[in-house]
A protein has these predicted regions:
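N-terminal assembly/interaction segments in proteins that build large macromolecular machines
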Residues: 2-308
Length: 308
């Protein structure tokens, strides 16, 4: 048979939802026969995966792996928590994390084109086979961050939340490991949007001040107070905003007195170790955050089954 045309490839892509190169290969392998090409893709699990890819994947695993001075925080989503807890998914996630550590991809698409760690196939091919032939659910490599330096991590509840912390210190990584993990746990628990007050955008702070002043103007108790007192109260409210929204100014969750901030904890531990520690970066992933998850009720499920 002659060369496969672009029109034929587009037709197969439209009918199956499979990518261009896979459709081209399927047509070439079957002498341009469209029906056989579709069957070929189904046998490979590609057509099945294409149909599944439209379904919301909001469950899954967040994992963190640190090897020496290189670490990765990775989120892989599945449709159900049952699938996320299978050995197949866990092994895949670990292999992908190690691929990121060793090969340093620029983004998810670059990652998919790489040979998976410990195997011979690409990450994309392994993902397709896993989704189409084994798990039979939509599986999505959603995001990752690769960091270098003195790192610590914390994974909450088997992969529902993951945090990676980068520290600047002259102390060895093993000496500051517990401190870094404690900071990561703090982030996991209270999810501060900023590390320190300097990180709060000027427009966000200005808006917060406007809200504070508006609240004070509506409070009848404030009308009789001197301007100096009002200013002090407003400053106190801004300080409270910082203590709630800036990680290092939050009350340290492990301190039972409620008087020690996260920064105070880090400084005290650094002094005890004879060095300095600065929290440089904190990345927090929460499984499925921002992914729209359709909630089906029982009646809908029964109706779907009856209409099949």
């Amino acid at each position: 048979m002659g060369k496969i045309s672009v029109a034929e490839i587009k037709e197969l892509m439209k009918s199956t939802g499979v990518g261009m190169m896979d459709c081209k290969k399927a047509l070439e392998a079957n002498d341009g026969d469209m029906d056989k090409a579709i069957e070929f893709l189904r046998e490979k699990g590609l057509a099945t995966q294409a149909k599944k890819s439209s379904r919301a994947a909001a469950e899954g695993i967040v994992t963190a792996v640190v090897e020496g001075n290189v670490g990765v925080l990775l989120e892989v989503n599945t449709e159900t928590d049952f699938a996320a807890n299978t050995d197949d998914i866990k092994n895949f996630v670990n292999a992908v994390a190690n691929t990121i550590i060793k090969q340093n991809p620029a983004d998810v698409e670059a990652l998919k084109a790489m040979t998976i760690d410990g195997g011979t196939a690409t990450v994309a091919d392994v993902l397709t086979e896993l989704a189409g032939m084994k798990i039979r659910e939509n599986i999505v490599i959603r995001r990752f961050v690769r960091m270098e330096g003195v790192l610590a991590s914390y994974i909450h509840n088997g992969g529902s939340i993951g945090v990676m912390v980068k520290l600047d210190t002259e102390l060895s990584a093993d000496k500051v490991a517990v401190i870094g993990k404690d900071v990561a746990m703090q982030s996991a628990a209270l999810n501060a949007p900023y590390i320190r007050r300097e990180d709060v955008p000027a427009e966000v702070l200005e808006k917060e001040k406007e809200i504070i002043l508006a609240q004070m103007a509506e409070d009848p108790k404030m009308s009789s107070k001197p301007e100096q007192v009002k200013t002090k109260i407003a400053e106190g409210k801004v300080g409270k905003y910082y203590s709630e929204n800036c990680l290092l100014e939050q009350a340290f969750v492990k301190d039972t007195t409620g008087k020690l901030s996260v920064q105070g904890y880090v400084d005290a531990e650094a002094k005890a170790l004879g060095g300095t520690i600065k929290v440089v970066d904190v990345i927090r992933y929460e499984r499925g955050e921002g992914v729209e998850k359709k909630e089906d009720n029982l009646a809908d499920e029964v109706a779907k089954m009856m209409n099949k």
